[in-house]
């Protein structure tokens, strides 16, 4: 770490090396995660084109430094040790909607704000991502964890991902069929974690009204308002209203959204739990497993709306699945609180909860 001592001591000072990039030295990473925790980056630069991504990588490699790329920071948590290399912050713009006759092709820059992408697509009459409204972060993050909500996920509409392949040292286009999508998983956060720096993605959307069946909470909301044949804009508005009612705004309350994945357990284990807890929410999934609601498990374990005095962390009163940073001073505090929740859920239900936000580096 001694080689980066000057970087950590000179916070915010620009360094030279690439004319096109403004590479900052010694930058707090708390501003690059909506949980607002973590250490310092030795170097950080905002990239606004694929060429700048390639330049940033070359700059770091020439100095034998590790390099990582992030988006809006809504699904990442930085370690207290920070990052002793170059952090590239994806700000690549772009929005192009092309009519293909029976469908629409939407190509967006990976640095675009995701909800702004959804809003523009919906305003153009396109359907397919309206239920993914108000999800924080950038477009480039959506295929990484196969973002999903209210019965839609990015894998349903993705055509391809454009990215810089650090292994092959060239730009590539990856078809959706080669992304290895699963529940909140893809090759980008599993087998090929860190290999691809996503620069753009192309989606296949429709000019059709949204189709039922709707996710239960969304369906009830629409039915209560007499919207039996809702427009795509009405579905977006409904999703926004539901999310705002139960989820904190990361701009005002430090959080990363859903902190734990909904666990999938074997059917016999689910049957035993249902015998003990008949009201437990559950859904069958392909392969014979059963998905449980992590928020319900956390709630029943006694962690809904808590404010832990030891760690400064807590959970959101309207949705126990959301871990919030009240006054934590370190990522270590967050990880201690996470362990408390996991231990109690495991003790009561025999179910292990997995963390959803990625711990970096």
From Swiss-Prot:
Q: Which reaction does it catalyse?
A: UDP-N-acetyl-alpha-D-muramate + NADP(+) = UDP-N-acetyl-3-O-(1-carboxyvinyl)-alpha-D-glucosamine + NADPH + H(+)
EC top class, as a word? oxidoreductase
E.C. number: 1.3.1.98
Q: Which UniProt keywords apply?
A: Cell cycle, Cell division, Cell shape, Cell wall biogenesis/degradation, Cytoplasm, FAD, Flavoprotein, NADP, Oxidoreductase, Peptidoglycan synthesis
The active-site annotation reads: 184, 258 (proton donor), 356
Q: What is its main location?
A: cytoplasm
In terms of Gene3D superfamilies, this protein maps to: 3.30.465.10, UDP-N-acetylenolpyruvoylglucosamine reductase, C-terminal domain, Uridine Diphospho-n-acetylenolpyruvylglucosamine Reductase, domain 2
**Cofactor(s) in the UniProt record:** FAD
Per the record, the pathway is: Cell wall biogenesis; peptidoglycan biosynthesis
The UniProt entry's GO CC annotations, sorted and at most eight, read: cytosol
Q: Which residues form the FAD-binding PCMH-type domain?
A: 35-208
| GO terms assigned for molecular function | FAD binding; UDP-N-acetylmuramate dehydrogenase activity
Q: What does this protein do?
A: Cell wall formation.
What's this protein's family per the entry?
Belongs to the MurB family.
Would you tell me the protein name for this molecule? UDP-N-acetylenolpyruvoylglucosamine reductase 1
| Organism of provenance | Symbiobacterium thermophilum (strain DSM 24528 / JCM 14929 / IAM 14863 / T)
């Amino acid at each position: 770490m001694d080689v980066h001592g000057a970087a950590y001591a000179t916070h915010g000072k620009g360094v030279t090396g690439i004319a096109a990039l403004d590479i900052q030295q010694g930058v707090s990473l708390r501003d690059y995660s909506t949980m607002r925790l973590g250490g310092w980056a030795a170097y950080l630069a905002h990239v606004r084109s694929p060429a700048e991504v390639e330049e940033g990588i070359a700059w770091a490699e020439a100095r034998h430094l590790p390099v990582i790329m992030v988006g809006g920071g809504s699904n990442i948590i930085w370690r207290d040790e920070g990052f002793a290399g170059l952090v590239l912050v994806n700000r690549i713009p772009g929005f192009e909607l092309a009519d293909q006759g029976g469908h629409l092709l939407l190509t967006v820059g990976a640095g675009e704000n995701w909800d702004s992408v959804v809003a523009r697509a919906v305003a153009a009459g396109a359907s397919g991502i309206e239920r993914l409204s108000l999800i924080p972060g950038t477009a480039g993050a959506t295929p990484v964890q196969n973002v999903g909500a209210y019965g839609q996920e990015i894998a349903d509409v993705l055509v391809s991902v454009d990215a810089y392949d650090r292994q092959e040292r060239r730009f590539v286009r990856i078809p959706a069929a080669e992304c290895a999508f699963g529940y909140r998983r893809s090759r980008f956060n599993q087998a090929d974690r860190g290999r691809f720096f996503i620069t753009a993605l192309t989606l296949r959307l429709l000019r059709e009204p949204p189709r039922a069946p709707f996710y239960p909470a969304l369906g009830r909301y629409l039915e209560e308002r007499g919207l039996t044949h809702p427009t795509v804009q009405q579905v977006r508005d409904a999703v926004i209203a539901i999310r705002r009612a139960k989820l904190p705004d990361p701009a005002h309350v430090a959080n990363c959204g859903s902190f734990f994945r909904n666990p999938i357990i074997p059917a016999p284990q689910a049957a035993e739990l249902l015998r003990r807890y008949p009201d437990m929410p559950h859904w069958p999934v392909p392969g014979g497993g059963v998905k449980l609601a992590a928020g319900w498990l956390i709630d029943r374990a006694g962690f809904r709306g808590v404010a832990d005095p030891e760690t400064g962390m807590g959970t959101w009163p309207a949705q126990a699945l959301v871990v919030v940073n009240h006054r934590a001073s370190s990522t270590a505090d967050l990880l201690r609180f996470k362990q408390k929740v996991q231990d109690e859920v495991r003790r009561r239900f025999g179910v292990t909860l997995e963390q959803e936000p990625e711990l970096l580096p």
